[in-house]
Amino acid sequence: MSKILSFGQPLGSIMQTAYVVDDLEAAARKWTKTLGIGPWLLLEHFEADNMTYYGEPTDIDLSVALAYTGSMCYELVFVHNDVPNVYADVVKDKGYGCFHHWAVSTETFDEDVARYKSQGYEVAFYGEVRPVGGKRFAYIDTRKDNGGMIELIEISPEVEGLFSMVKGMSENWDGKDIIRRPE
């Protein structure tokens, strides 16, 4: 049996679905109104180091909003600047509001990246997230086979803590304070 992470998903399973939006706060409010998902934690100007886009350095500036319903995390992504990036690649084909990727938790990051590469997939976006101790993420471009990308998220106590905190915000939520920012 797989290890169950503190936010309710088995290690190695899909833990998040993500969508690209053109207005983060407006989209979060619409998702709350139509789907009852919330509250949303808004992480503005996402802090990551060593980011690459298909192997080339990128200075993408993005913000994300995270929220839960049950044990599934939803991520809304907004890009602030006009540099080549994985989000613009998908918006070009599908428009804003579109599905972008599934995120999968991993404790075997390097092996998982190598496995996808051996299957002919490319790492489209990579970075090391500052607020969670430099833990890594990699977007694998699997669009040709499943219509979306797969984000590998390297699990650590800090990463687990972030997702558990966001999930905890949704438990017994009274529907108020839809948008929240880190203190």
Go through the PLM ranges and name each one:
Residues 1-15, 19-41, 54-121, 134-135, ...:
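Glyoxalase I/VOC metalloenzyme domain signal
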Residues 41-45, 127-128:
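Conserved catalytic-core motifs of GNAT/GCN5-like acyltransferases
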